[in-house]
Amino acid sequence: MLKNPFITYGYEGPEYFCDRVQETKSLTGLLQNGNNVVLMSPRRMGKTGLLMHSFGQAEVAEEYNTFLIDIYATSNLQDLVFSMGKAILSQLMPRGQKALSRFVKTVSSLRPVMSVDIMGNPNWSIEPSRSEDPSYSLDQIFKYLSESDRPNIVAIDEFQQIVFYPEKNVEAVLRTLIQRCKNTVWVFSGSSRHLLSEMFISPARPFYA
């Protein structure tokens, strides 16, 4: 059987990313101008690929820290904290010990844990360093972003998942933290047009603009 030469899912780099020139230009332009962005489309329509491609553009990659956080599998605020911490950690690892140490010092309620898979490759995860309210860890993560050495772009994929968290006022808590977070532009990406529209268009919701 012949191997399929075509990429059917995922992002494999700019040389395999077809079309969406205008979308990439529009998105990078909005982010560079300091605009938060809501990105909606059905699942498997290329939102994540567009974000990764935009993050890889020279004008973005050379000037910003970029973090892509997928929260589709999260079910509560603690899961969100771990997803954010792990995504930030994975971007910091190639930058060396100094960057990692600053993260660990600022976000003291979380600690990075390294394990090795059967192939000998290191894997990093996040664990609580002590029993803390996840809201406290979230505060520390946002503090880290505000004090970053250069501007950040944070994309939260499947953002509508926070609607289903059991904790109260998650939207209001995140809205407050995001408003206070300096130095950071946000992308709220999701596949549920109905839920995202309600979150950002309804005057009764915290993210109403």
PLM region descriptions:
Residues 198-209:
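Helix-loop-helix "sensor" segment of P-loop NTPases
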